[in-house]
Regions:
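P-loop potassium selectivity filter motif centered on the GYG triad
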Residues: 241-249, 342, 350
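Short, Lys/Arg-rich, polar N-terminal cytosolic tail immediately upstream
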Residues: 1-11
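A juxtamembrane structural motif centered on a specific transmembrane helix
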Residues: 1-3, 33, 326-374
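Hydrophobic alpha-helical transmembrane segments of multi-pass inner membrane proteins, especially
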Residues: 19-27, 31-35, 39-232, 271-331, ...
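Transmembrane helix boundary and interhelical junction motifs in multipass membrane proteins
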Residues: 165-170, 248-253, 264-266, 283, ...
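Long extracytoplasmic/lumenal interhelical loops at the membrane interface
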Residues: 244-280, 307
Length: 374
C-alpha cells in the first residue's frame, strides 16, 4: 500500500507547485463566496459546507499523496462496482429532478443528515479502474479486453444520461476519449469511434428533458427563449460585461447581490466573480486553471509506468473539461450543463472528489520513476 520511500524523499519529491496552484485557485473561491451567497437564505449553510469540504478535501489530498498510487489499480474494480451500484440506485431513488436548479436525479440523501452526488465519486473510481485496464491492453493487446474496456467506459456514461445528467456524462465521455488518445488508438478505430458517436447523438437527444434540449437550442441560437432557457446566460453576460477591469468590488455587484444570476454560487460563480473582481479576477482563474492542467500533463509525461500516465492524463482531462465547460457556458461558448468550476464552486462532493484526484496525481508525481507494479 505504501511505496518504500523515506519521509525525507516524500517531502523532497512532493509536488508543491501543483498543490500551490490548486490552493491559489481555492483561495479565490474562499474570498469570493461570502459575497456571492450574502443575499441568499441558504448562504451560511453553503459557506459551512464549502469550508468543511475544503478541509476534508485537503485531508484526502494529503492521504492519497502518501499512498502509492499504483496500489489503486488493484482496488479500482471494487470502487468502480460500488460506483455503478450507486449510479443505478440514484435513477429511481435519487432526488433533484423536480428541482429547477438541478433537473436530474443526481443526488442521494442519507437520512436527512447530508447528501452527495454519486457521479462525482464515480469520477475518482472511474479513473482508478479504467487506467489499469488500458495498462493491461498496452502490455498485451486483446480484443476481449478492448471490448471490456469499451463496455466499462460507456456503461457509467449511459447510466448518468438516464438521470438525465448531460453535463456530467459529457465529462466522462471526454476523459474516456483522452484515455483512448493516450493509449494510441489506430486512426481507423478512431474514425469508427467518431462515426458511432455521431450516430448515437439522436438517441442521446431522446433521453434529454425538454429544458435540456432548450439549453442546447439557446446555445445554437442565443435569441431562442431569452426569458426562459436563455435567461441564465444572458444574465451571466451582463454581469461579466459590467465588471470591467477591476470589478465592482465584493458585496457590490448589482447582478450578484440582486440575485440576478441564477445558481451564482455554483454553475455561474465565474460570472459573479467577473462582476465583482473584474477581468483581473477572471484572468487569474483562467491562468491558474491553465497552469494546473499543464502541470498535470508534465507529470503524466514524466511517469515511467503506463498506469501513471493513464491515471494522471485521465484525471487531468476530467478537471480540464470542468474548467472548459463551466467558463465556456458563462461566456456563451458552451451550452449550459450545470458543471461546477473546480475548487471554486459550492458543491461538497465535487470539491472533495477534485482534491482526491489532485492527491493521486501528486502521488504519481512523487513516484514517477517507479516502473514495476507493487
Amino acid at each position: 500500500m505504501f511505496n518504500k520511500i523515506s519521509i525525507k524523499t516524500f517531502f523532497k519529491k512532493f509536488d508543491y507547485i501543483l498543490l500551490g496552484l490548486v490552493l491559489a485557485l481555492t483561495a479565490i473561491g474562499v474570498i469570493a463566496m461570502p459575497s456571492v451567497v450574502d443575499t441568499m437564505n441558504s448562504g451560511p449553510s453553503i459557506l459551512k459546507t464549502q469550508m468543511f469540504s475544503i478541509a476534508l478535501g485537503l485531508v484526502l489530498c494529503l492521504g492519497f499523496s502518501i499512498i502509492d498510487y499504483s496500489f489503486l489499480r488493484y482496488w479500482g474494480i471494487v470502487f468502480y462496482i460500488i460506483g455503478l451500484i450507486m449510479l443505478i440506485y440514484v435513477i429511481p431513488f435519487g432526488y433533484g429532478r423536480d428541482d429547477p436548479n438541478i433537473g436530474s436525479n443526481s443526488w442521494i440523501d442519507l437520512f436527512g443528515v447530508f447528501s452527495f452526488q454519486p457521479s462525482e465519486l464515480m469520477k475518482v473510481a472511474y479513473m482508478m479502474f479504467l487506467p489499469s485496464q488500458f495498462e493491461l491492453l498496452k502490455e498485451e493487446f486483446s480484443i476481449k479486453r478492448l471490448i471490456f474496456i469499451a463496455i466499462s467506459g460507456l456503461l457509467p456514461i449511459g447510466l448518468i444520461l438516464l438521470q438525465p445528467d448531460l453535463g456530467t456524462s459529457t465529462v466522462f465521455a471526454f476523459s474516456f476519449a483522452v484515455l483512448i488518445f493516450v493509449y494510441g488508438i489506430k486512426y481507423r478505430y478512431l474514425i469508427i469511434s467518431v462515426a458511432v458517436l455521431a450516430a448515437s447523438l439522436p438517441f442521446v437527444w431522446l433521453f434529454l428533458d425538454t429544458w435540456q434540449k432548450n439549453r442546447i437550442r439557446v446555445f445554437i441560437d442565443p435569441t431562442f427563449d431569452p426569458s426562459g432557457a436563455g435567461y441564465q446566460t444572458s444574465k451571466s453576460i451582463v454581469a461579466l460585461g459590467s465588471g470591467g477591469l477591476k470589478g465592482a468590488g465584493l458585496f457590490n455587484g448589482i447582478q450578484t447581490q440582486g440575485n440576478g444570476i441564477p445558481v451564482k454560487e455554483s454553475d455561474f460563480i465565474f460570472s459573479s466573480i467577473g462582476e465583482e473582481m473584474g477581468f483581473i479576477g477572471c484572468s487569474a482563474i483562467v491562468i491558474l486553471a491553465f497552469l494546473i492542467i499543464i502541470r498535470c500533463i508534465y507529470i503524466a509525461s514524466k511517469s515511467h509506468s503506463y498506469y501513471g500516465q493513464f491515471i494522471v492524463a485521465g484525471m487531468a482531462a476530467m478537471i480540464a473539461f470542468h474548467f472548459i465547460e463551466n467558463i465556456g457556458m458563462n461566456i456563451e461558448l458552451m451550452p449550459v450543463t450545470g458543471i461546477p468550476l473546480p475548487f471554486i464552486s459550492a458543491g461538497g462532493t465535487n470539491l472533495i472528489g477534485s482534491f482526491a484526484m489532485i492527491g493521486i496525481i501528486i502521488s504519481a508525481s512523487i513516484r514517477r520513476d517507479q516502473i514495476k507494479r507493487i
